[in-house]
Design a protein with these regions (language model features):
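HIT superfamily nucleotide-processing domains
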Residues: 1-161
Length: 161
């Protein structure tokens, strides 16, 4: 039997969640956007790479305000979230040439939200055949690019949008 080793997953699976909100922590550290994989900050929203992505280029669009419910977003926050979602779909198209996207939010822990108390939208680029047997049978994802490489590629590409 062949084995695929993904030791980076043990960091996610085995660690305890730090106290506080990971999004708020990333937002507070203004001097280290690259270390936190924050790609862009606007007035009410920011965009960052998912630290445990489903595919290369998996992004999170997050309101700066710590708010857990879609229904409690301010109109300006909702507008900026979807404005940046559009902008980063264009960015991902240029940088990675995906064939499609999944866009969505998991509202509540039972719905699959990893950070249920801070609303965020996922942008997941998709390619034909990217969900093969590895994900379905082995609960494993094969990532072809490191997060730092993805971050730098998107930081450069966003300048052209």
């Amino acid at each position: 039997m062949d084995r695929l080793w993904a030791p980076w997953r043990s960091e996610y699976v085995g660690k305890e969640s730090p106290p506080g909100c990971i999004f708020c922590a990333a937002l507070q550290n203004n001097n280290s956007d690259e270390d936190n994989y924050v790609l862009l900050r606007t007035g009410k929203v920011f965009v960052m790479l998912n630290l445990y992505p489903y595919t290369n280029g998996h992004l999170l669009v997050v309101p700066k305000r710590h708010v857990g419910e879609l229904t409690t977003l301010e109109k300006e926050e909702a507008f900026e979230i979807f404005q940046l979602t559009q902008k980063f779909i264009q960015t991902l198209k240029l940088a990675f040439k995906p064939e499609g996207f999944n866009i969505g939010a998991n509202l509540g822990k039972v719905a699959g939200a990893g950070v249920p108390d801070h609303f965020h939208v996922h942008i997941v680029p998709r390619w034909q055949g990217d969900t093969n047997f590895m994900t379905a049978i082995n609960n494993t994802r094969v990532m072809s690019e490191e997060l730092k490489t993805t971050y730098r590629k998107l930081k450069e590409t966003i300048k052209n949008i």
